Amino acid sequence: MHFKPFVFALLILFITPAVFAQEADNNNKTSDTQLSEPSELQIFRKAFPDTTFTATYSERLEDWLITVSCPTTPITTANPATSSKRREITFCWCEGRLIPEAELKRKSHYLPVLEEYPFGGELQSPSTYTKAQIEEYRQAGLASARKNEPFASQFLSDFMYYGSSRKSVEQHLARIKFLGHKVTVNEFIIEPLARVEKRILEERKTSTTIDTFLKGIDHMDGYNWREIRDVERKSLHGTAIAIDFLPIKMNKYMYWRWTKDILGDKWMLASLKSRWMPPYEIINIFEEEGFIWGGKWLIWDNMHFEYRPELIEFYKQTHTEKQ
């Protein structure tokens, strides 16, 4: 009986440090998790400075929850306080897919939002394609592959640009004049397009190439609520963040599908000289202002530009890190 207090004291002496050690270990795990938010969030923050991306770790889902908060209407340079109202949504990070929790069971259908886009530079001549490259183009153009392959998640862009339904996006459209042509676009890309226009018109003063190109444009297409052929998903024209340049003379190849109808399986080998393309000076200006050009896709669409500043920022950050 006299030994019981002594034994109890010994137990406390040995058990207490173990408990504290375990507690410290748990705290370290929490701390590590808090410090390990997805690094790609910095890309989104830089691409969309008026939008906040807040990460909270979910033990239940074992994944990050990303709360996105953006203005209800565009905040412009001329009117920086245009809107103090904001809207919020929370996505699961899901390895960069940014999808609602309800879509987790279908996550294999989606690719990450951030995908490689070859910012800057010029196109490779088709005459130098390897057999592997030609096969890659051929596979990309197969209807079966295009319909069944996973695609980049659009839940973020649908939220930011009200693209989840035709009714919602049509409440945020504007008819503007761009490079002398009327076009309907999402109100959130009016200012980026204005920056593009200002730079192109300035370059036009000393560039006969740009002047000739602009004089050859018949009209432009912007908003069009429709699906992409063969894949049954909404085009970004449906979100109104894309525009197409349509020339007066349609005497060159400008879209892979139309080219395939003429050249068959050798559509990807159409020479650059035989393709209708904007001058690189114009392409570079668009890219520097956050737009990507469809002419750099495997299934190329040379008339097409769309506002994707996150892809431009993704290229800059990943390629800077590699240097």
Q: For each predicted feature, which ranges?
A:
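Active-site acidic/histidine clusters and adjacent loop/turn architecture
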Residues: S144-F213
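N-terminal accessory beta-strand-rich subdomains and adjacent acidic, glycine-rich linkers
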Residues: D32-S165
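Catalytic cores and adjacent binding grooves of peptidoglycan-active enzymes
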Residues: D32-T51, A55-T82, R87-W93, E227-Q323
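Bacterial N-terminal signal peptides
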Residues: F8-P17
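Bacterial N-terminal signal peptides that target proteins for export
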Residues: M1-V7
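A generic secondary-structure signal for well-formed alpha-helical elements
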Residues: F14, I200-T208, E289-G290, P309
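Acidic, glycine-rich low-complexity/disordered segments
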Residues: T209-I228
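Boundary at the C-terminal end of the N-terminal hydrophobic targeting segment
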Residues: V19-E23
